[in-house]
Structure formats: structure tokens, C-alpha cells
Curated annotation (Swiss-Prot):
Record InterPro entries: Chaperonin_Cpn60_CS (IPR018370), Cpn60/GroEL (IPR001844), Cpn60/GroEL/TCP-1 (IPR002423), GroEL-like_apical_dom_sf (IPR027409), GROEL-like_equatorial_sf (IPR027413), TCP-1-like_intermed_sf (IPR027410)
Domain of life: Bacteria
Keyword Transcription among UniProt keywords: no
HAMAP family linked: CH60
Lineage: Bacteria, Pseudomonadati, Pseudomonadota, Alphaproteobacteria, Hyphomicrobiales
SUPFAM superfamilies recorded: GroEL apical domain-like, GroEL equatorial domain-like, GroEL-intermediate domain like
Name assigned to this protein: Chaperonin GroEL
């Protein structure tokens, strides 16, 4: 086992504090509408430019192991906030640094670290309750756009696009962000349920120009096994032909004579038909077939349920107003499923999302939820250069997460003002002087984001903070973008409560642990062994010239 270096007390805390400061100072320059960019070297390709706090935090690795431990602990604040709220990582880092700095001073002055931490926790709980009480629910598309605009660093076009996407696919719908192939940023919305399986044969195409198969008012047969035997299919095909409606077959696979017969019938014009493979794999495939069945009001034909293909009747088939099938995707629009059944299925999937511990499963469940609940929107981010596109994509991701958080828990005045106001409302009392000191640490620390935003804009923070606090209106604050005071909510300068709350809770949690640290252990660097000596000359080689 390698030898370890152990540092205690003040020496350990000073090293750790230095690491915290290095990471926080690199991150906090990005805060606010006038925050600056950070350039990150990449081992290959162009450097990356970003204003995203967590992206900066993840790149910081320090040479000194003790300093690095402090930096990594603070990085955890940014990462955890990003995982929970998806935005507010810079605010969380600034709060973490402020609490650690104030706490370290108090510990150096001889206060008990555990009591300080208890005081910090008391104050944080009160501030969180105050934020939730003051939260304003957002209802209109304009309010959604405002939140998106602020998080995208004042870019109104992005805010508007996110609001439009949310309006079209609903709050449960999936909105993904991709890099565009062009310089324009655009929004594409796919309504209905789409899955990534295309037609099994190009002969099913109804529109040769676009190479898509469009089926209007179609029946849908859902089968979980392979279809290769034509005899079993005949009763269904005959029943559908009588109705002169098109038929879509979704099965594990359709092959052999079954596929050949379907293609021949389609080409002769006797039967409007198309076949696609079922989406997903294994258990996920069964679940997705069930989803499609509920959406279209049909049944999954499965021998597990004792239903044989030969005995299928028309009322077991799903229905949809329109089905569009391309080479890669199938979209089912306006299925005939009962709303109550779809809602029950959505509730069931939400329950599974809460219970699952696997990130992969959660992602798949959320995809299924979106497909059932409304649709999928894709925001394609464009730019003149690859570096610009990547930087913009970071901002769109943040804006999207902030908007979702705002819809969930509501909004408060932005620009750090909500925390600034909360600092004057803390009434918690500690059981001793050290806990009181912990409460005061939070009072001072939660002013840090507002001060940092104004400092980044080149303003004098103390003057502006003083002026804001002189006014008693909850929403009165300072608009750093244009240097004016006013009602921040009506100006559209807002923060999602979930983002502010999560940032504060995570910052206090990690900062509390850092303050109560008394010893640090790190591996000593290995000493390089001395190089081996040169071997002696070989005998019997005299008389040779070199």
C-alpha cells in the first residue's frame, strides 16, 4: 500500500479552501447577463468556449492533492445541482464558496464546526420555505419564454423557441437539443407517437417522391412474435379488405411468404398495407407494444394472453387517423385510444420513473412517457462555427432545464434578488452563540450571487445591494443588462424556484461538510527509483575500433 500524507486542522483547511477558491473563481466569472466566457483546452480539436458553470467545474483538476480535494468537493455542488435542476450550477458554486469562506473564518476564530453546521442548516431550511412561499406559478407562454431567455443569457429567440416547443408537446413531452447542419437555429415538432422503425420493404411506399408510406384512417395489428406463415394472417387480411381501410402490421418481424404476399397484394392494389418491426428490445418491446395498443385502442396479439392470430377480429385491432412511415421512422397520429386509459398508463409510467434506480431505464421510461403524452420536439442549434454551435447548445440546454424547473415549482425575482430579500427574513434562533454564528453565515452568504452578478457587470456591488434592500417591494431589483432598477417580474428577469432552492441546499450541504473537516489524507507521490547503472563491457572484444 502506498504511503499517505496526512494534514490536520488549520493546515488542512487552508489547503482545501485554496482549492475551493480556484474552482469557484474560474466558475463565477460566467454568472449573469454580463458574465464572461471560459475557454477550455481540448486534447484534440478546437478549444471549447462556454458560459456553463458545470462544464467549467468539471474541467478543473489541481496538481496539489489537498487543494484538489477541496475543488472536487465544490465541483460536487455544481454536478448535483445540474442533475437535479439542470441549471443554476454557477449560483450553487458561488453560494458554496461564500459559505465555506465565512465558515472557515468562524472556525479559525475558535467556534465549534458542528454547531456552525447546525446553524447553517436551520437558516437554509427557513430560506427554502420562504422561497417556496413566494413562488409565482407560471401559466402563459410569455412567462415560459422569459425564463428561457434569462437562462439562455438574454437570447429572446431561444426563449421563444422553447416556449413554442412546450406549447406543442406539453409539459410531459420530450424536447431534445441537437446540433444543426446549417447556421440557422430551428424547431421541429413531431406530433403523435413516433418510433425508430421504418417500412420492411420499399414496395409499401405510397408517395414515391418523398419515399414515405401514408395510411389514412388505418387499422393497426400489433403482434409480438415473428410473422412468416401466411395462413395465420389470412382471416385478419380478409376482414380488413371488407372495410376497404388500410392496415399497418407491427410485429417482431415479417418475413418469408407472409412478407412476399403482402407486397404482391399491395402492388396489385387489392390491399393498402404496410409492415414495420416493433420498436425496442426484450421487455422494453413488450411495454412499447402495450403503449401503442393503449394509444390506438387495440390489443397486443400475444400467445401469453391466449390470443391466437387466426382468431383475431376487427375490434382487437387499433385505429389511427393517420400513420406515416419513412425509411427510418413510423409516426402514429391521433390514435383511437380512450383518454382515461392513456392517462392511467401515463400515471403508471410516472410511478415507474420515480421508483427506478437505473439512469438508462429512467431515460427509456421518459421517452415512452413523452410518446404517450404528446409528442417530441427537436431544437436544432445552428451557428457559424463548430465552437459557436457547442457554446450555444450549452445555453439552450440550460434554458430548457430552467424552463422545466419553472413550470414545476414556479418563479421568483431573478438576478439573485430572491435570496437577497430572504437574507433579511431569517428569524431562526440557535441554541447557542455558535449556532447563531452559523445562521449569520447564511445571512451573508446568500447575498453572494447578487453581488457577483453586479461585479461581473463592472458595477459596485455594495451600492446596488444597499439600494435594492432600501426598497420594500419583494420584486424590486436591478436589471444588470441595462443598468436600471424596477419590478423584476414584470421586466421578465426571473429565476425558477427549483433552481435557486436546489443550488442553496446543495451548496450548504457540501460547505457544511468542508467546514467540519479536521483531517485530510492523500497519497504521497511515488518516488522514482534511481536508474540502473550501465552494464560492464563484454569480454573478448579487445582490438575493435568504435
Amino acid at each position: 500500500m502506498a504511503a499517505k500524507d496526512v494534514k490536520f486542522g488549520r493546515t488542512a483547511r487552508e489547503k482545501m479552501l485554496r482549492g475551493v477558491d480556484i474552482l469557484a473563481d474560474a466558475v463565477k466569472v460566467t454568472l449573469g447577463p454580463k458574465g464572461r466566457n471560459v475557454v477550455i483546452e481540448k486534447s484534440f480539436g478546437a478549444p471549447r468556449i462556454t458560459k456553463d458553470g458545470v462544464s467549467v467545474a468539471k474541467e478543473v483538476e489541481l496538481e496539489d492533492k489537498f487543494e484538489n480535494m477541496g475543488a472536487q468537493m465544490l465541483r460536487e455542488v455544481a454536478s448535483k445541482t445540474n442533475d437535479t435542476a439542470g441549471d443554476g450550477t454557477t449560483t450553487a458554486t458561488v453560494l458554496g464558496q461564500a459559505i465555506v469562506q465565512e465558515g472557515a473564518k468562524a472556525v479559525a476564530a475558535g467556534m465549534n464546526p458542528m454547531d456552525l453546521k447546525r446553524g447553517i442548516d436551520l437558516a437554509v431550511n427557513e430560506v427554502v420555505a420562504e422561497l417556496l412561499k413566494k413562488a409565482k406559478k407560471i401559466n402563459t407562454s410569455e412567462e415560459v419564454a422569459q425564463v428561457g431567455t434569462i437562462s439562455a443569457n438574454g437570447e429572446a429567440e431561444i426563449g421563444k423557441m422553447i416556449a413554442e416547443a412546450m406549447q406543442k408537446v406539453g409539459n410531459e413531452g420530450v424536447i431534445t437539443v441537437e446540433e444543426a447542419k446549417t447556421a440557422e437555429t430551428e424547431l421541429e415538432v413531431v406530433e403523435g407517437m413516433q418510433f425508430d422503425r421504418g417500412y420492411l420493404s420499399p414496395y409499401f411506399v405510397t408517395n414515391p417522391e418523398k419515399m414515405v408510406a401514408d395510411l389514412e384512417d388505418a387499422y393497426i395489428l400489433l403482434h409480438e412474435k415473428k410473422l412468416s406463415n401466411l395462413q395465420a394472417l389470412l382471416p385478419v387480411l380478409e376482414a380488413v379488405v371488407q372495410t376497404s381501410k388500410p392496415l399497418l402490421i407491427i410485429a417482431e418481424d415479417v418475413e418469408g411468404e407472409a412478407l412476399a404476399t403482402l407486397v404482391v397484394n399491395k402492388l396489385r392494389g387489392g390491399l393498402k398495407i404496410a409492415a414495420v418491426k416493433a420498436p425496442g428490445f426484450g421487455d422494453c418491446r413488450k411495454a412499447m407494444l402495450e403503449d401503442i395498443a393503449i394509444l390506438t385502442g387495440g390489443q397486443v396479439i400475444s400467445e401469453d394472453l391466449g390470443i391466437k392470430l387466426e382468431s383475431v377480429t376487427l375490434d382487437m385491432l387499433g385505429r389511427a387517423k393517420k400513420v406515416s412511415i419513412s425509411k427510418e421512422n413510423t409516426t402514429i397520429v391521433d390514435g383511437a385510444g380512450q383518454k382515461a386509459e392513456i392517462d392511467a398508463r401515463v400515471g403508471q409510467i410516472k410511478q415507474q420513473i420515480e421508483e427506478t434506480t437505473s439512469d438508462y431505464d429512467r431515460e427509456k421510461l421518459q421517452e415512452r412517457l413523452a410518446k404517450l403524452a404528446g409528442g417530441v420536439a427537436v431544437i436544432r442549434v445552428g451557428g457559424a462555427t463548430e465552437v459557436e454551435v457547442k457554446e450555444k447548445k450549452d445555453r439552450v440546454d440550460d434554458a430548457l432545464n430552467a424552463t422545466r424547473a419553472a413550470v414545476e415549482e414556479g418563479i421568483v425575482a431573478g438576478g439573485g434578488t430572491a435570496l437577497l430579500r430572504a437574507s433579511t427574513k431569517i428569524t431562526a434562533k440557535g441554541v447557542n452563540a455558535d449556532q447563531e454564528a452559523g445562521i449569520n453565515i447564511v445571512r451573508r452568504a446568500i447575498q453572494a450571487p447578487a453581488r457577483q452578478i453586479t461585479t461581473n457587470a463592472g458595477e459596485e456591488a455594495s451600492v446596488i445591494v444597499g439600494k435594492i434592500l432600501e426598497n420594500t417591494s419583494e420584486t424590486f431589483g436591478y436589471n444588470t443588462a441595462n443598468g436600471e432598477y424596477g419590478d423584476l417580474i414584470s421586466l421578465g428577469i426571473v429565476d425558477p424556484v427549483k433552481v435557486v432552492r436546489t443550488a442553496l441546499q446543495n451548496a450548504a450541504s457540501v460547505a457544511g461538510l468542508l467546514i467540519t473537516t479536521e483531517a485530510m489524507i492523500a497519497e504521497l507521490p511515488k518516488k522514482d527509483a534511481a536508474p540502473a547503472g550501465m552494464p560492464g563491457g563484454m569480454g573478448g572484444m579487445g582490438g575493435m575500433d568504435f
